[in-house]
């Protein structure tokens, strides 16, 4: 296609957009942003010539690699520890992808720029493709992995699991509230521009080190589309910056979007990489080192900081606090311990830690053993049924954590937990910023300006409240996390598939589970103050 014909074709596509001049169109997806002064630029024009042939080639490579993995016996070599965590990851990730596809009509409706609508429509096609190849990857794992239990129920389990619902909250953020907040700042400017680096670049590297070369093939194919999505987001961001009235909203949304992405993505991907690997070479990057390279240098310094020249206040404090939480406060390690504590209500198995693991963690995170080593030794000791309860119900010096109302990751850095009465309910938050998000950002007014499109953080956001006072065996049964024999749990605290060493419903029966947040709301003021003070001091034995 010649340059002239390309220009003509692009102009013809733009003509398909109809803008009524005699009536005000109905607003389907509201936004508090204004675009009256916005410049108009279309990032699609540069790739229109090759888009469909390019995507076809990428799909062919993905499905060819899947066929090659089966023929090459990849599943004889892949580490079980790694693939078990993929049961959780691959149950979650297709949902944010399809939510991103659903977000594009929101952006198209909210942004009055026919030029950019083409690029957003193509992004919608991308996101559907991403979700499709990820679902096919999950199906291939299920059909060929030694233990398909968990892979075969991921769509159901994702929606009712204490960890999966964190990912659901993350993906729903793309399609709820203010259309620009959700579909542009939260999704494109932060999630796709920053955190896909660790999701789709750093994590595939770890997969390959554990004998899984299918996940890198799929997710590098996904990541190759992200540059166009980043361009879409940046174009809308520049349009919003053209109107000074949008600046407070942009600064609000950057704080919310950055922090919620950090809380959720770093929790999940950090755990998958650090605790799902068997590769303990000392020169292998830790998640903290990956984060410094991919998030701090590649995104914060190269993308966020230059926005200051437009007069935006960048959330420097939150970037530094996220780094501090990962490096100094052990955020990823706290998340891994929490997931392992909850193993009876998992639909994946979590491996025990070895001396090699301990040595690597201490090398990468000096002081790790003093804080986490003893607990993991207890996890190893309590891994098999018969003589003990699940570790969550044993005296191992660990108190089951409170859930954060906003990001839904528990308040694992206990000294930072915020407790406030909001909308008539005592709520717990993992941080001051998550409290601000609920109490200030997602409200009908922000800094004296009406923001009716932001919505609220509502619903049953604390998984534990749904199962308060129930027997653990009944919870597992209700969730459906039982194997085909009708008694053996899907989740196990080890990787041994010997039926004699696997936990059953009878092994976990008799343990009553209580919600920390329900109990908190039942306390008197004095009881609550004492409880919160003890929790912030490090918690008491469960």
UniProtKB/Swiss-Prot annotation:
Signal peptide residues on this chain, from the entry's feature table: none
Inducing factors: By acetone. Transcriptionally activated by MimR.
Cofactors that this protein relies on: Fe(2+)
Residues annotated for Fe cation 2 binding in this entry: 127, 192, 226, 229
EC identifiers of the protein: 1.14.13.227
GO molecular function, one term: monooxygenase activity
Organism domain of life: Bacteria
Alphabetical keyword list: Iron, Metal-binding, Monooxygenase, NAD, Oxidoreductase
Function statement: Component of the propane 2-monooxygenase multicomponent enzyme system which is involved in the degradation of propane via the O2-dependent hydroxylation of propane. Also involved in the degradation of acetone via the O2-dependent hydroxylation of acetone. Also able to catalyze the oxidation of phenol, methylethylketone (2-butanone), 1-propanol and 2-propanol.
Entry's family note: Belongs to the TmoA/XamoA family.
Subunit structure: The propane 2-monooxygenase multicomponent enzyme system is composed of an electron transfer component and a monooxygenase component interacting with the effector protein MimD. The electron transfer component is composed of a reductase (MimB), and the monooxygenase component is formed by a large subunit (MimA) and a small subunit (MimC). Requires the presence of the chaperonin-like protein MimG to ensure a productive folding, resulting of a soluble MimA, which leads to the active form of MimABCD.
The name this protein goes by in its record: Propane 2-monooxygenase, hydroxylase component large subunit
Source organism per UniProt: Mycolicibacterium goodii
